[in-house]
Regions:
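Structured core of small recognition/catalytic domains
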Residues: 116-175
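Short S/T/G/P-rich N-terminal loop/turn motif that feeds into the first structured element of a domain
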Residues: 1-124, 140, 156-159
Length: 175
């Protein structure tokens, strides 16, 4: 099995139906031997971010399209910071999502080494809990999830670990 990040924009009518769409996605993924790891919706309910544990990109695309979701992005990702079992128990904890478009030429090994060196520095901002990161296998971007009292604290935490921010979104777990 592999992890796939799916981003989908939601139109106003879909916002009310997101639970039904995710139920359909779960059923489609299950038919392909997969499962939804988590689904987060941006605060304004304009975008849903889904992580699927499924056999391959083709199976992920098929499941998402059959669930009626429009795919804006579908990429293989690597999980950093928690294992799948921990996510299933804690996925409702994260309330902020930070996006970072990774610089060209950065390797996964270099990224992981830097992450390991810098992660202890999050202790400088104790009100923020780093939850997990999904790093696109093509090294195009990463999504970092945090539990935090507010956006300013997330920004301070990112500064503590010298990590850039391209976007910060308040999120809510929906599955």
């Amino acid at each position: 099995m592999a992890l796939f990040l799916i981003e989908s924009k939601l139109i106003p009518g879909e916002r009310r139906r997101i639970t039904q769409m995710l139920d359909r996605l779960a059923a489609e993924a299950k038919q392909a031997g997969g499962d939804i790891v988590e689904a987060q919706v941006s605060e304004e309910a304009a975008r849903v971010i889904i992580v699927l544990d499924i056999g391959d990109a083709r199976g992920a695309r098929h499941a998402v399209e059959n669930a009626g979701l429009d795919i804006q992005l579908l990429k293989a990702v690597r999980l950093v910071g928690q294992d799948l079992q921990a996510i299933k128990q804690r996925k409702g904890t994260a309330n902020y999502l930070v996006e970072w478009n990774l610089p060209a030429g950065l390797s996964m090994d270099a990224y992981l080494k830097r992450k390991a060196e810098k992660t202890p520095l999050y202790a400088e901002v104790p009100e923020v809990s780093f939850e997990r990161t999904y790093v696109c296998e093509d090294m195009s971007k990463c999504l970092c999830l945090y539990a935090s009292p507010d956006e300013d604290a997330v920004v301070r935490a990112r500064k503590a670990v010298s990590a850039p921010i391209d976007a910060v979104n308040k999120i809510k777990n929906v599955r």
